[in-house]
Amino acid sequence: MPGSALHEVFLPAERSMVTAPAQPSPLPRPALDSHTHLDMIDLPVPEVVAAARAAGIVRVVTVGTDLTSSRWSARCAAEHAAVYAAVAIHPNDTEAATGPGRLPRDPRAPHASVSPPAVAPLTAGEVLAEIEALACSPRVVAVGETGLDYYRDHAAPDVQRWWFREHIKIAKRVGKALMIHDREAHADVLRILEEEGPPDRVVFHCFSGDVPMVKQCAEAGYVMSFAGNVTYRNAQPLRDAAAAAPADLILAETDAPFLTPVPNRGKPNEPALTADTLRCLAEVKGMDLAALCDAVTATAQRTFGPW
């Protein structure tokens, strides 16, 4: 998720004025969307999953950003065979994490306006304890998205860093992958990982680093997940990074409903469009598309576990 809930989301009234994205042609081999937000997509989960499968995207990881959406993601994964979950407090939400949080979104009416119930704020320890409990579920494959976001000022950097360290500890205790949100914070993210000792499996979601950072991540064995912005005309530095990334350390994602890839940019994003990003990555890397799909699937199973 590139920021917080303030980012553009296609609401029902808006969607009627926006042409639905063109369905990609099916991939030659199955692959997955390693990072999406099904609770923010204005479609029923079964419909989203069916469209993804038609495009060759057979697995989806839906990601929590606060306690409420993490609960929702874990429950969604338990109810849908093609869906897995990640749970955490997004860096932009760390200062608000001890308040009531936003309500869960019903996939049948994900943007319904409902007043939150009056509840006593939780302590940071209570929030983290529930994140850890959720992370122990077999359908939860990662602790994330956590990390640092210095682009926005929704939470002070020192607060973000404290929560990031706590999430690293949880990922190591529960033996799950760590899914990182890193926006304009590369040096601090890498430093904190080194200071804390990284979990066995680390994923940089929506990778935004340059070629030197690719080399640092590759040396550490960190996985780099590329989103739809790699297809944008002004994203040549990101394509250079993707070209330099080892094929066995790459994943693809939508981060839906954000960052819709070309040729559907400006339309609602959804997991099916991971196929467009994979086609771009195959071209950038000079790889056969089927071979890249197989490599991404192998990396996903090594990172998140077999399915």
Task: Place the predicted regions along the sequence by residue.
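Mid-domain alpha/beta scaffold segments of enzyme catalytic cores
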Residues: 1-307
